Amino acid sequence: MFCKLPFCVTIEAEAFGAEVSLNSLYGVPAVARFRYERVEDIPALPEMDFSTGRVREVLRAATILRDMGETVILNIEGPFTVLSQLVPSKQIYKGLYRQQERLRELSAWITAQLVRYAREAERHGVNVLSYADPTVAADLISPKLYADLCGEISYEVLKAVEAATENIVLHLCNKTSVAFQKAGFCTMERIIPQPGLTYGEALLEAIKRLDVRCIGHGCIQRTYCPMTNGCIYKLTLK
């Protein structure tokens, strides 16, 4: 039905200099130690290099899957989740109140690189970008902080990706999309699929529609689960 890449949340952060190793307990790549101690210690970050490292292998895998006729989903992490793998999360939360301008600067650079990544992903056969930024989920910070800073930055990422790609569909995790709608960053429209489909089957039909560029209020992890609410939620970014 779908093939999902990658198998961890460290691809983007590693491209920005995070030290990643294989976690012996869980058997997945994880940050071995933080590269920086504080937000103010983070220098100018490098550009993502798609010709080397694991990011290259992710894109190569997408091409292989596309050539096999698969529908490919690429998980992509938002700016704050990327930063939380370069510096302790505690420092990120402090920075939300004390260093907003620096976080905006870093996020703007990361956003530009994520847009490049999205373009490369589309070129290599990715059909859906599954976006999340769980470090600054709406239930972890105040509604005002989400609307004025964290949600706004995610909105900028998504608008830029949408503008830079032609056919990729964005899929927002449930927490992100609900918070997005509450904060006024998007509108929602229900798409009613034929009865008896799983979430993945309904999603597969929805992404074929030319008017659908963003979907939310659902979970990619429920691909094989029967539809419970009977609809797919099309989101339109404002």
Regions found by a protein language model. Give the residues of each.
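Catalytic cores of TIM-barrel enzymes
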Residues: M1-Y93, L106-K238
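A solvent-exposed, charged loop/short amphipathic helix patch at secondary-structure junctions
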Residues: Q91-E101
